[in-house]
Amino acid sequence: MKKILLLVVALVGVVALYGAERERVNGINYRADDEYSQKMCRVDVSYEKGAKDRPVIVWFHGGGLTGGGREIPQAILRDGVVVVGVGYRFSPHVKVKQIIDDAAKAVEWVYNNVEQYGGSREKIYLSGHSAGGYLVSMVALDKSYLAKYCLDADKLAGVIPFSGQAITHFEERRSRGISDKQPIVDSLAPMYHVRAD
């Protein structure tokens, strides 16, 4: 009996040490305008079973706006955090503005659905690497993208871009026939939308 009790205590300790059991739901569609949107515009959600009011990291993958795939990086999976990996459409199938709109639409989906996965609408952080960093910067700084979905960019808890371009993205410049060595800052550059607030 003592051995069984000791084993139960040890197992409870392991569960407490490693946190709650994580669940994962893959391939939830957030935009279905056409067949291509239906295929590409999906999210994966990793969350702790039974959790409530958790911070949410919405992760956008890199790939130059022309490739890559939705992911939930192991490095950001932490106890107490809901992580949403976002897929989006690529150039040249759609224009860069449409890709940014995909990012905003994904944020709308997170805002409207994250509570059922234990997340909090007041604790949504946007993050991404490379092209993903560019997308989260555009969605957060050019308020018109989220405003289209009745969301206020100022209500985001934070934005954490990794290696995202602050000037107009090279894929947008390429689509206009502008050399990738010629930097421009226009309405498709995050730094164009930097605000004092």
Describe every region a protein language model picked out:
Residues I4-G13:
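Sec-dependent N-terminal signal peptides
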Residues G19-A51:
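N-terminal cap/lid segment of alpha/beta-hydrolase-fold proteins
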Residues D53-G62:
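Short beta-strand element of the alpha/beta-hydrolase
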Residues G63, G87-V94, Q165:
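Short beta-to-alpha linker loops that shape the active-site pocket of alpha/beta-hydrolase fold enzymes
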Residues G69-V86:
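Short amphipathic alpha-helix adjacent to the substrate-entry channel of hydrolases
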Residues V94-E115, M138:
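Alpha/beta-hydrolase active-site loop
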Residues Y111-R174, D186:
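Primarily recognizes the serine-hydrolase "nucleophile elbow" in alpha/beta-hydrolase
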Residues P183-D197:
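Serine-hydrolase catalytic core
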